[in-house]
Amino acid sequence: MAFTPFPPRQPTASARLPLTLMTLDDWALATITGADSEKYMQGQVTADVSQMAEDQHLLAAHCDAKGKMWSNLRLFRDGDGFAWIERRSVREPQLTELKKYAVFSKVTIAPDDERVLLGVAGFQARAALANLFSELPSKEKQVVKEGATTLLWFEHPAERFLIVTDEATANMLTDKLRGEAELNNSQQWLALNIEAGFPVIDAANSGQFIPQATNLQALGGISFKKGCYTGQEMVARAKFRGANKRALWLLAGSASRLPEAGEDLELKMGENWRRTGTVLAAVKLEDGQVVVQVVMNNDMEPDSIFRVRDDANTLHIEPLPYSLEE
């Protein structure tokens, strides 16, 4: 990608975030085009893509035959097919899996590094973008297209926008916003996704979890009414037989080091500590607070105390902006 990422700054929690323009270089774009695009994706992901409108985007999972997620995909209609955004670390293996049956269909599946991914969030983000685009997405219309640009709207943790565009428009946006917006890199968007409870699947956790272990059902990313797709039997069994005992949690507190994706944490049990969970992502905020996204048992006590392994500091559970009650 020729567009140069912005230098990193310590991320800020959404409640205190000034207007910020971010380069999302830790995320990557991919597309499927061709006459069979919809049918093909319908047989591969957990969401009902046939019901997706032009002005919708959603988080779906692409699973293996055992129902474990290769990746999750932020999916939207693009041209005569679909585009999706996923973590860059999983894009290549995910596309390899997705292409396995493509020889039998009229589809072309490819990475897209021509377009640039930008995020806009923070204080008066809508007002800042309103001067640059004739229409902005909203709760009622979550995807808006204008020329070479697609804008995606997110409600949580506070209103923000993801922009998929060409290099020329990305440069124009940077020039126009440079004076009033702080510039930051992917870590700020990652911090917002952790706060929003959007599961982050990097390479370390690819092929490890069924979608429900990362709350995908609560985020509208699983259809239990659609036809067959890879891994469907296991995903359905987890729902109808209560086989899923895990959930995605948000922890906050202090830690002397950031836990890495795939690492476990420790849970306080009386005077002792017991290993628990799998970290999906973690970020240290500019106020020193550490936020951690972790998959653990779904019956954790709300006042449980955790720590990064052998650390002197502790982490506690924070509420997510959505309910897990079905």
Swiss-Prot record:
Any one Pfam family match given in the protein's UniProt record, by short name: GCV_T
UniProt keywords, alphabetically: Cytoplasm, Folate-binding, tRNA processing
Entry keyword tRNA processing: yes
Function recorded in the entry: Folate-binding protein involved in regulating the level of ATP-DnaA and in the modification of some tRNAs. It is probably a key factor in regulatory networks that act via tRNA modification, such as initiation of chromosomal replication.
Residues binding folate: W27, W189
GO cellular component, one term: cytosol
BP GO annotations: iron-sulfur cluster assembly; RNA modification; tRNA processing
NCBIfam families referenced in this protein's UniProt entry, alphabetically: PRK09559.1, ygfZ_signature
Record's subcellular location: Cytoplasm
Similarity comment: family membership: Belongs to the tRNA-modifying YgfZ family.
PANTHER family: TRANSFERASE CAF17, MITOCHONDRIAL-RELATED
Protein name stated in the entry: tRNA-modifying protein YgfZ
Origin species: Escherichia coli (strain K12)
GO terms for MF: folic acid binding
